[in-house]
Amino acid sequence: MSKKGSYKSVGGDFRYGDESVSRFINAVMLDGKKDVAAKIVYDAFDIIAEKMTGENPLEVYRKAMSNIAPVVEVRSKRVGGATYQIPMEVKSSRRGALAFRWLKLYAAKRGGRSMAEKFAAELMDAANEQGASVKKRDEVHRMADANKAFAHFRF
């Protein structure tokens, strides 16, 4: 019998009906204040709609998420007294979670504006293959590429 619970869908968000946006709102949420998190995310989408006229904010968000999400990462494994950094493919659920985490982290580190403006700026930069969260993804990919020699140690 499987010990792992079944996958629970979070359902769509209020405005777009998109499950990914709903997951992002949940990632932004602090202390169970979902309304505050939703307001921040939707305000960020409104700012994107203002600044990038003719662009759908949901499409900018999706493009940014695909640009931030890592494909490979390194995992530590101990082999014969030595610890190796082994490159491994990232599962799709973890890929999204890492993208949310990095976007939230690097948006918060931006200048002293509102959080919605910070998210909007980071999402627009990520959609254009720029920004700190995309640099983090590139750094993770470089680490995996540098340790390609240890790929045969896979779990």
Curated annotation (Swiss-Prot):
The keyword Repeat does not apply. It holds the Pfam family Ribosomal_S7. CDD domains: uS7_Bacteria (cd14869). Keywords: Ribonucleoprotein, Ribosomal protein, RNA-binding, rRNA-binding, tRNA-binding. One of its GO terms (biological process) is translation. InterPro entries: Ribosomal_uS7 (IPR000235), Ribosomal_uS7_bac/org-type (IPR005717), Ribosomal_uS7_dom (IPR023798), Ribosomal_uS7_dom_sf (IPR036823). GO terms for molecular function: rRNA binding; structural constituent of ribosome; tRNA binding. The keyword Ribonucleoprotein applies. GO terms for cellular component: small ribosomal subunit. One of the primary rRNA binding proteins, it binds directly to 16S rRNA where it nucleates assembly of the head domain of the 30S subunit. Is located at the subunit interface close to the decoding center, probably blocks exit of the E-site tRNA. Belongs to the universal ribosomal protein uS7 family. PANTHER family: RIBOSOMAL PROTEIN S7. Part of the 30S ribosomal subunit. Contacts proteins S9 and S11. This is Small ribosomal subunit protein uS7. The gene is rpsG.
